[in-house]
């Protein structure tokens, strides 16, 4: 077997070359080099068997250190090496490596142990001797020509070089370099046949090891397995980071609040929540982000051009794991199952949050009630329900406890909707709404109910639907005791009590929780009916009303009563019907105790006791207890008969007369006497018959 040359494992970039690399290339470089350093450390005692010169090894360390840090950093009293100390841009130190630390002198190109090294000690690591230290301030090495003094011999030796600081080797195409070796490597990478180009993403690399590392991100090869939990990783450095999740080690602390993290990059991201710094801004919609990963994910919303494509719908994603998660929306796969209640989840985050509801063992606890959460933001959001704090204030005076709701509210003033559907042009305030809307065009319904098989476009819709099977109603109104199955219904209900919806009608002052509800209400005042029935031309204020109306033409009755077999065309009628069997409506009549499903139904019923008839006909003055009775009566004056029999063509002015007539053709007799079994076409005949018993 051929021996491995030093150049096959040691990757050196000059600062000029480093500036030409992309972010993904730099990230891969760090992982490969950290791994290489560790491997070389392991064989450090037997250099003579591997034909690797010690100077090359030290150059390798120095070069890695040169590119392991980010942003310029000014340090006071930095005269030790005769120049300012800088941090090279576009990289982040993910973990500490023995002998690899970020503080570098721009004059001598050597690297010190850290900020503290400048104030206290200088490390000397020569010919593999144990580390020796010198007191800071002592500078035994003085340059005879310029008088500059150094405490560290390598700094002095580099300063003595006549070409120090000069770039003597020019690339005719683009840049200059301080050594012939660096120029040759640059020419191979950018102007020769040297670089290996990845066929999948187009990135180019000189070094085989860096190229192979990139390839693992595409093939998802993970050769480094952590023994304790068998989780595999593409890079050794990732394995070490993962190890901290088991050991609980968090060596990186936030300077402001002391919060600890397992990785320095997480600390840097977290510290931006204190400073408010959002370095990455989207030029298309203006949205700003704390860190690059979130920004890149956001840009895919605009471009749809992620490198990893879904084979089913072609949608692009930033990482293979994101594609896998997305595919589950097509397959319905939910690999994360709760051992306590059997509920399954498609992603790990949702599963972890759910488990906290059983174990109460989240890392972030509410100080008031002790409820646990998996993230500090969720905990803070919850705590505002106790304190009543609403820190996000709009210019209109309305305050919100959550930034997300605040941002959505702001769009009601600005009208800003940056996310636009490519097919119909409809715009939305957030990308989630756009994704759900796009499924209307594609017909995609990835969320299926396990009990009845019904499919839905959104996870919210299926959660609401599943509660119709379980009967779960977790949202209870403290004012009237009414329980509701989902949050939106609860919020709408609360507006009845508070009158504090964000959308207020200028004519009658009534409040609504959403713009769509508000627009529907406005049509009551304007008389606008934009939804027309294709069969009879009748107009309706809402799309849901026209859907119900069309069933009067088609005869569709999807809601069947299991107790008596009666079928109904709409859900509200079905619920009202069920109360006739159970008598268990949440809203009770104060006079007779009868239960109803809606407060409005109770009010209508109570008029049968009080005799109140608030709806009066303008033509003849006749009064009615309900608005629908008035509308039917008005057809007597207008001559309108919208309900036509398909069998004989006879028209009717009200649905009850129409349905009664239809039964003369179908011979259907839905009203059966329990005493003698005789059946009847209509309820009035049935009631008359009952009196004979």
UniProtKB/Swiss-Prot annotation:
KRAB domain mapped to chain residues: 4-79
Keywords carried by this UniProt record: DNA-binding, Metal-binding, Nucleus, Repeat, Transcription, Transcription regulation, Zinc, Zinc-finger
InterPro entries: KRAB (IPR001909), KRAB_dom_sf (IPR036051), Znf_C2H2_sf (IPR036236), Znf_C2H2_type (IPR013087)
Keyword Transport carried by entry: no
One GO biological process term: regulation of transcription by RNA polymerase II
Main location: nucleus
GO-annotated cellular components: nucleus
Superkingdom, taxonomy of origin: Eukaryota
GO molecular function, one term: RNA polymerase II transcription regulatory region sequence-specific DNA binding
Protein's cellular compartments: Nucleus
Chain ranges of zinc fingers (C2H2-type): 169-190, 196-218, 224-246, 252-274, 280-302, 308-330, 336-358, 364-386, 392-413, 419-441, 447-469, 475-497, 503-525, 531-553, 559-581, 587-609, 615-637, 643-665, 671-693
Family designation: Belongs to the krueppel C2H2-type zinc-finger protein family.
Function, in words: May be involved in transcriptional regulation.
Name the record gives this protein: Zinc finger protein 441
Species of origin: Homo sapiens (Human)
């Amino acid at each position: 077997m051929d021996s491995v040359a030093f150049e096959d494992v040691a990757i050196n970039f000059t600062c000029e070359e480093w500036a030409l690399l992309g972010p993904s290339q730099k990230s891969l470089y760090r992982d490969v080099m950290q791994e290489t350093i560790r491997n070389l450390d392991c064989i450090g005692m037997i250099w003579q068997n591997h034909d690797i010169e010690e100077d090359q090894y030290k150059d390798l360390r120095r070069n890695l250190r040169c590119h392991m840090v980010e942003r310029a950093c000014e340090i006071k009293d930095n005269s030790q090496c005769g120049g300012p100390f800088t941090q090279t841009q576009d990289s982040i130190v993910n973990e500490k490596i023995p002998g690899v630390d970020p503080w570098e002198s721009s004059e001598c190109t050597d690297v010190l142990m850290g900020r503290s090294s400048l104030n206290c000690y200088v490390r000397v690591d020569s010919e593999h001797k144990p580390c020796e230290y010198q007191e800071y301030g002592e500078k035994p090495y003085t340059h005879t020509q310029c008088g500059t003094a150094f405490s560290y011999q390598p700094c002095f030796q580099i300063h003595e070089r006549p070409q120090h600081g000069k770039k003597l080797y020019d690339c005719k195409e683009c840049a200059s370099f301080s050594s012939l070796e660096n120029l040759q490597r640059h020419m191979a990478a950018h102007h020769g046949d040297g670089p290996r180009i990845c066929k999948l993403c187009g990135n180019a690399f000189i070094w085989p090891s860096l190229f192979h590392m990139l390839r693992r991100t595409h093939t998802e090869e993970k050769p480094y397995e952590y023994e304790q939990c068998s989780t595999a990783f593409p890079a050794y450095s990732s394995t070490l980071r993962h190890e901290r999740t088991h050991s609980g080690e968090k060596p990186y602390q936030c300077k402001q609040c002391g919060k600890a993290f397992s990785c320095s990059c997480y600390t840097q991201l977290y510290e931006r929540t204190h400073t408010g710094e959002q370095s990455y801004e989207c030029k298309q919609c203006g949205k700003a982000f704390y860190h690059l990963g979130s920004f890149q994910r956001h840009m895919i919303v605009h471009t749809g051009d992620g490198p990893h494509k879904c084979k089913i719908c072609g949608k692009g994603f930033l990482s293979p794991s994101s594609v896998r998660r997305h595919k589950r929306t097509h397959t319905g796969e939910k690999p994360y199952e709760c051992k306590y209640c059997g509920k399954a989840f498609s992603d790990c985050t949702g599963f972890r949050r759910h488990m906290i509801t059983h174990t109460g063992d989240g890392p972030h606890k509410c100080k008031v009630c002790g409820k646990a959460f998996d993230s500090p933001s969720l905990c803070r959001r919850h705590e505002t329900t106790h304190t009543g704090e609403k820190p996000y204030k709009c210019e209109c005076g309305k305050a919100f406890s959550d930034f997300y709701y605040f941002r959505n509210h702001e769009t009601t003033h600005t009208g800003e909707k940056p996310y636009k559907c490519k097919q119909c042009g409809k715009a939305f305030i957030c990308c989630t709404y756009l994704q759900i809307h796009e499924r209307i065009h594609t017909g995609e319904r990835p969320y299926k109910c396990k009990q009845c098989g019904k499919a839905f476009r959104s996870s919210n819709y299926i959660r609401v639907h599943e509660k119709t099977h379980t009967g779960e109603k977790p949202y209870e109104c403290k004012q009237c005791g009414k329980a509701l199955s989902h949050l939106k219904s609860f919020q709408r209900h609360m507006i009845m009590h508070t009158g504090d919806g964000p959308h207020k009608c200028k004519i009658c002052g009534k409040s609504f929780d959403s713009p769509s509800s508000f627009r529907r209400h406005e049509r009551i005042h304007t008389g606008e009916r934009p939804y027309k029935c294709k069969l009879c031309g009748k107009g309706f204020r809402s799309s849901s009303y026209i859907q119900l109306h069309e069933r009067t033409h088609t005869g569709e009755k999807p809601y069947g009563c299991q107790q008596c077999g009666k079928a109904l065309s709409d859900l509200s009628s079905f619920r009202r019907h069920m109360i006739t069997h159970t008598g268990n409506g949440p809203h009770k009549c104060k006079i007779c105790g009868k239960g109803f499903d809606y407060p409005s139904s109770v009010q209508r019923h109570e008029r049968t006791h009080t005799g109140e008839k608030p709806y009066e006909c303008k033509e003849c003055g006749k009064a009615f207890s309900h608005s629908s009775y008035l509308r039917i009566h008005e057809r007597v004056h207008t001559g309108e008969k919208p309900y036509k029999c398909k069998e004989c063509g006879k028209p009717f002015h009200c649905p009850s007369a129409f349905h009664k007539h239809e039964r003369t053709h179908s011979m259907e007799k839905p009203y059966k006497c329990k005493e003698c079994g005789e059946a009847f076409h209509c309820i009035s005949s049935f009631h008359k018959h009952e009196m004979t018993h």
